[in-house]
């Protein structure tokens, strides 16, 4: 099997396309479920199918209990992860569409920055259209989530919501002007603010229960021990600069634009014309 085999290429193109769509959609669904809350209960590990009453749940005994997803999976392996992804609602599904649309806009702006010729023209043309759809979907999702599922972090969530909205609008305006670099920058900031909004909505929890607030998993309950936090902090101090360093270096090394023009040393039989975005 090689790149010359059409069936082999087609099979992997299909797999790559499906995977590329599934990742942002499922990530958005997970975020939506986290914000809205999941159908989880706290059960005593000695009798895992017997619910602990909300009045009996506190930090002291929660450490001896288990959080169960309540979607009929029981003790099925990875049931909590599955409930996060498939125990969805209309809000969670909208979250999947939002993340997918934001990813499309980000990709279009990035293509406009990294390509030349016809490819760049197509990316510049499609970016504002995708940006308009993305902005509308994000606005509905964020306003719905902020006011329907507000908690203790409402004020911070509102601040991040406003910042994300401003950045999305500015990004959209730059996209319509063809200023791809500025559009990409502000869309990136908007995505960062959106992530901050999600965790502000969760505060002071890391996982909310839609059945009863007493069943929610709080930051205090899920935090690591002091020793573990020290190890993690030291590791972060050492590794984060390294990661940032090689990321900046790789971006700098690959700063040139990609063109469909023939490149010296590239074997002609490795180019597949007429079957990808580069040639339409």
Task: List PLM regions with ranges.
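...captures the hydrophobic TM-helix bundle architecture rather than a specific catalytic motif
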Residues: 16-33, 187-194, 239-247, 251
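Short, highly charged, low-complexity non-transmembrane loops/tails of multi-pass membrane proteins
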Residues: 190, 256-276
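Membrane-interface capping segments at transmembrane-helix boundaries
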Residues: 174-181, 245-261
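Short, membrane-exposed interhelical loops at transmembrane-helix boundaries
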Residues: 209-231
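Divalent metal-coordination and catalytic microenvironments
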Residues: 106, 202, 250
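Conserved small/polar residues in nucleotide/adenosyl-binding loops
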Residues: 1-5
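Peri-membrane helix termini and adjoining interfacial loops of integral membrane proteins
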Residues: 45-47, 70-71, 207-217
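Long, contiguous internal "core" modules enriched in hydrophobic/ aromatic residues
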Residues: 6-182, 197
